[in-house]
Each structure stands twice: as structure tokens, then as C-alpha cells.
Amino acid sequence: MRRTLTLIVASLLMLVDTVNAENDVNIGKSNIKLESRMMTPEALWAMGRIGTVEASPDGKQVVYQVGYYSVKQNKGHQVICIMDADGKNRRQLTTSSKSETDPTWLDAQTIAFITGGEIWTMKADGSERKQLSKTDGEVEGFKFSPDRQKVIIIKSMPFHEIIKKNPDDLPKATGRRVTDLMYRHWDHYVESIQHPFLAKLEMRNEKLEISSNLIDILEGEPYECPMEPFGGIEQLAWSPDSKTIAYTCRKKTGAQYAISTDSDIYLYNIGTRETKNLCKPEGYQAPEVDASHTLADQKVNATGAHVGYDQNPQFSPDGKYIAWQSMARDGYEADLNRLCIYTMADGSMKFVDWKSDVESFCWAPAKDKQAVLYFLSVWHGCCNMYSMNWKGEVKQLTETWDDWTGLQLANDGKRILATRQSLSTPTDIYMVTPAVKKQPTKIEQISFENKHILDQLTFGKMQQYWVPTTDGKKELVWVMLPANYEEGKKYPTLLFCEGGPQSPVSQFWSYRWNFQMMAANGYVVVAPNRHGLPGFGQEWKEQISGDWTGQCINDYLSAIDFAADSLPFVDRNHLGAVGASFGGFSVYFLAGHHNKRFKAFIAHDGAFNLESMYTDTEEVFFSNWEYDDAYWNKNRTARADKTYENSPHKFVDKWDTPILCIHGEKDYRIVYNQGMGAFNAARLRGIPAELLIFPDENHWVLKPQNGILWQRTFFDFLNKWLK
């Protein structure tokens, strides 16, 4: 369930736009005037959300995408904005009520974008809008070749290999005949898959158009590219000479897809239409595997081949190398995300020697003597920026309490265009000049998307502590003070339980799990970086697999006990525990093991019954790796026994505290029967409980009115039991 920060941010913007694809009214930037200085759900949803960002070829301008939302209309609107590279002269280019997304520069004066499922262009001032593609509204992503003679177009095609097509004489039949696993993914049934298509840019009647003659790069192959559920155009790359395309693909279907994370990087030669796998030796055949047992100790992970996730390729500026993110082991989605560098001349590979996951990266200019690559990585609760030279030496460029969430060259060869957020600030755009010799890194904020709202708010202050753990180590714990904090007073306190289970408690800005919203409601937030989280070494992260109810639970209790015992502003008699996904699982488990510490629990989309979860979830590789075995295996491992024996549903007899269970019915990762089961069990035991269930939401809550209902229910419940 763990995903990188960049993918999560990009996918959320994409999914929200999909939910709100049809817009009747032009929804624009909010001029909300707040009645108090405390954050409200309405203020949160009034904020603009920055998405795609790109510098012009001459480095003089920046085009970017922003999402605005209307609570009344219950939908969003994606618009395109432009500004000078120093942040001046910001203006919105979108004037239509239709969303406009994925802006990119065709040349220094022309911007290409998607609207209505087609590729359009406009001048940098928003004029001369022209439609380039004619695909019946099917474009879902695109990328121009460096020579601007060709374009990759992402579009979906029908897929009936697993869910069979219903007979033509039964057009109103709603049943689905399923023949294998992966019949649904994340929040949808898999009845279509994305493929990349190649097209030429042609001049017709003195007008630039995209040829309707599309070449399917994966013609005849039943595989998706980009990869579901979060992959985008970043999973494909052009070579500098525009003759080759590198793409990401997991060439598996059905049960084999469901149990494996083995994706590869492929090279597609446009002239010959031949494809080469860069990650496997020629003739490689994957060993047979036991689909109901972890792949950790199976032959597939002893082959020496690249058998984990390999994705997001980028060619070096001179075309001599390709870099991509690479995981070593099949079946382990939270493996160390390494940066692999492939040499085109001889096929050799090397990996950047780094202690944590590479979240995203970009190549430095070809003539740069200080760096070869720039990348982002989480370390000690912050996602900062780093550079690497040809010697493999890594240098930290930023050292702020923030999460840098995206980076690319600013096209002047000297600066990096990046996005950044924190627990106290939503995403904005920055220009970063990397440190050179004695000159420190220079950081300049160039967008101020939500300044007019932030200036009206009072935020809680953040503190950092290193708390001893029961295994003799220390965990980093973020503590957020209430926005109305007064020295000498005590405040109700929330233990935040992170999901993943290998997602970082870093400086993320969330439009649901927003710490400043909790602070505005008068709560202290205690957020521990327990065992299992990245940014503290691979041993710390990997400890959690097979031990969901052991050390990480002790870490939660160590953090909240430290807060109650050592922080004078924490009211130990009014403690709550909240969390989503694995955090929701943690809440369900704590409900039976907290020894009267807590007065309220909230679990969002959490796993309650692990035996049910094993066969309910769609990405079986996750359950296999984390549990070791299917529950029916007679010779299952001791770790598997421990996992199933400690499933939260087996300790309901010890529940004694009010609980709110939240779930989305379109959540196919942790199916909604988990939340309903927990709620039903609590009520059958006579425990005060509430269930908030969304028929139209997935693992997240994406619609504005549902988001506000979520916030109101969350705080109504906490206020009832903790104040």
C-alpha cells in the first residue's frame, strides 16, 4: 500500500480531476473571507492545489496547473496559469469552464495541454487556441519528442481477458464474468487498459496537427502502460535524438500480476519497432512461484535479475545513459527505491549508494561539473534535495523542515524548478540554485497560491522530539501544538497512526489528515515515525513486515506515554488515537490493547480482519510479503501465525472505548466490509460507535462535500469524547 510522495501527489490531482471531469460553471480562485483565524474545512477546500509545473525552453517563464474546488457544486476545475521565472506577472490562461490539464511547452512561445480529452495548443498569452489531436476525446496523457516531430499519446483500449465481454444480445446486463485475479484495481473494475501510442506531428493546410495514424507501442500485448493505479506519463521517456522510447511495464496478467511487483524498463526502437528489455538478460524465464506464500524466500528473488519495481526512466542529456528508480525484490513494494544508471553502450548498470528511498530525480545539464543527477529523498522526517556527481558522491542541497515534492531543470542550466510543502504550508513553486563551493543553496519562492488564505489563519507550532523505544533505539516524533495554544494550559491530544505501513510521517500537507486542522480544533497532535517508516535506514523500515502488532505498536505507546508524562500541555486524561489504512489497522488493534490510555478512536479505511483482508485486497503481493502466507497454508511461517493470531477482530472482547469507523465502498485495497465489520462488532458489544461510509469514494475522500462531511464527523466525534 506504500507509494512514493510524488506519485501520491500527482495521482490525487489526476483522480480528483477525473471525478470532476464535467464542469458547467467556471470554478476559479476563491476569495474567501474567514470569520476567525482558525482553520475550517471550508478554508481548506478553498485553497488552490498546484499540480504539473514546467519551465519554458528559454527558462524565462513557468507554466503550471492549479485545481480549484466548489463545495456548492461538489466538483473541481483544473486551470492553467503562467508566470515569469521570478514569480512576477502571474496570470490564469484558462477561461473555459472545461478543465485544462498537463501543460507542457511545445516551444518557447507555445503551450500544449489537454482539454476535453484532446491535445490543444495556445500561445503563452492564452491566445490562438488550436486542437492538435482528434481521438474522440480519448487522450489521457502525452509527451512530445525532443525534435517536436512526434508525440506519445496515452489512451485506453478495451480489455476483456479477465472480465469477459457480455453477449451483444444482452446490452442491459450488468453482471461481470470474471476468470482471473486483478479484475479490479484501486477503485475500478479492469475493463480497459492504457497503452502508449506513437503519432507524427504534421503540417496540413499550414496548420500543425497530430496524425490520426496511431502506432500502438504495445500492439497485441495484454499489458498496461503506464502502470495502474498511479502511473502517468513519467513512466515513459524520449531519447534525446527522438529515435527511441523507454517505457515502464509489468508484463504480467491475472494472478501473476496480482502477486508480483516485477516491472521492467523497455526500449522501443521507432525505426524497427523492436523492443528490448533493459532489466532482464535475453531469454530470461521467471521461475514458478507459490502464489499463496511470500516471494521473499522463493527462487524468483535469487536470480540476480531486476525482479522488483523498475520505473520512471529518464535519458541523460547526451543520450549515453538512462536512469530509473529500481527495487531489487519481487513482491516487496516498499523495498529500497534505488537510483539505477544504465550505460547504453555496453548495458552495464550501477546504483547510487544512498541510505534511503529516491522519491524523484532529474539529470543535471550535460556540462555541469558539480552534479550528474538531482534527487529527492526522505531522511529523518523531511524530504530534501540532493545531488550526485560521477564519483557517486551525494551532497545534501536543502536542509529544511519541508517535503520537496517535485524537481526539474529550470532550463537555464543553473537552477532547479521545484515544488515544496510542509505540515504548515500547502504546495508552492520554488527556484533552487544549488550550492557551489562556498556558496550555499539559494531557495526562492516564486508562487504564493494560497497566501490570501494563509494570511487569515493562525497555525499551531511544530516541535520535534527523539523518544526512546522499547528496543533501545529512538524514534523521531513530531508534535503539533494547538493553534490557540496558551502556556500553562492542558489540551486533548491525538496520537496519529501513519499508514503504509511504510509511508513516512514527513512534512506532508494533506487535505484530509491535516495537522493544522486538528490544531485549529484545539488538539495537540503526536505523530511518531515508528518502526516501519522510511528515512531511518532500511533495517528500521523492514522491521515491520511480519510484525504489525509488535514493535511498531510499542513505538506508538512509547510516543504517547512520553507526551503524557513529559509534555506539560498534554492532557493525559483526554487522549485519542486516529489513523488511516495501516494506521486504521493500528487503531483497531490499539482498541483491544491500550490499557485505558485512550478515550476515543477513529479508524479510516483500516484492516480489521486480516484473514478476510488477505483474499479481499486486489494487490496480493502486499499481503503475501507482509503476512508471509495465506491463512489456509498448513505449513505457514511463525510470522504468519503471529500475524493472523493478532488480527484486531480477535480482540473485540477487550474493546471498551468509543470508536468511529470510516470507509469508502469503492476502496478495493482495503474493502469496506472491514470498516462495517468493526462498527458492527462494537455495537454488538454495546460500545458507543459510529460508521461513516461513502458509496462513491475509494481509499481516499476526493469530493468536496464528502471531504467536509469527513472533517465535521471527525471533529464532532472527537469533541464529544475528548472535550
Language model features with spans:
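Conserved beta-propeller blade repeats
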Residues: 47-62, 97-114, 129, 136-151, ...
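A short helix->beta-strand "capping" segment at the edge of beta-propeller domains
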Residues: 28-48, 210-222
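Active-site-proximal cap/loop segments of hydrolase catalytic domains
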Residues: 514, 519, 527-723
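Cap/lid segment of the alpha/beta-hydrolase catalytic domain
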Residues: 441, 448-573, 580, 615
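Beta-strand-rich domains and repeat architectures in extracellular enzymes and scaffolds
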Residues: 42-78
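Predominantly five- to eight-bladed beta-propeller fold
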Residues: 24-28, 77-78, 153-220, 248-251, ...
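Short loop/turn segments that connect beta-strands within beta-propeller blades
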Residues: 84-88, 123-127, 202-204, 269-273, ...
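Short glycine/acidic-enriched loop and turn motifs that connect beta-strands
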Residues: 68-72, 158-161, 252-255, 328-331, ...
